[in-house]
Amino acid sequence: MEGTTTVFHGTNIKGSMTRIKNELISHTDLYVWTQINFAYHSNKIEGSKLSKDQTIQIFEANDLTMDLDDALEAQNHFRLFDYMLETVDEPLSKEMMIQMNMILKRGTSYEDNPAYNVGGFKVRENGIGMINSFKTTKPADVETELDALLEKFQNKGVLSFEDIVEFHVCFERIHPFGDGNGRTGRMIMFKQCLQNNCIPFVLLDRDRAFYLRGLKEWDFERNYLMDTLLTQQDVYASVCEQFDIFKDFGQKELSKNKIVDENEQYVLFETDEGMYQLVADDQIIGETEKNNIKDALESITSKKSN
């Protein structure tokens, strides 16, 4: 609808999420965009020197003529994403985490280096970030802490977006592997978003500093990381809109659904497929406009055209 923007800030949106999952599994344009950008940005955050064009070259032509470890990790990230899609409906386990990390490091110089213990958990202490690095779980405690983490979140049932982010913080603070923890953890977040009907996202390298600050300050100010990742969600939702993933969710369909909440920035309404959040760029939805979503949408459109 002209004059409105649909975003999904962690709400359950089962119908649209089914579409996103199907688009990715079917290797459509959204799949290609996600593969290239996810591999490029997630590896770049961890120090890869590959350009975006080189990442595309590896994806399209399997060209590994650049720095071998960087090229292999880009190629492996594509394979890791495919593995995640193949197992998206399976519960997360320690064994799956290990398999994810093994796929990422396969064929690299790390694979046969006993210091990195690829195929198992870390054997020496590590940290997050190169500058102002903060400590992580000791190697001897990794399995115990992972067991506790998995049990805690499995007991929650359906996870909210904040639950998924909290799980990621806990996983990164454990830092269970010798290398590749950030990329493995971000792939787990993508999987958990698809599993729990939350819009997934690709963390952009430009926001690396905000991401690391959010991880470090989570206990004191959750909004640092939440706001950073909610912004990434908005970017991915916009990409989905460009590929017409949400094209059938127009005013005619939404007009039949019940508004359950509203404030100065959004209308939250309920459908048979879950909760939707319609954002209208700071347009206030008045009390008299809450009878049905059709009136609210027409009001937003009218206000933005005046």
Predicted regions and their residues:
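FIC/Doc superfamily catalytic core
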Residues: M1-D179, R183-N306
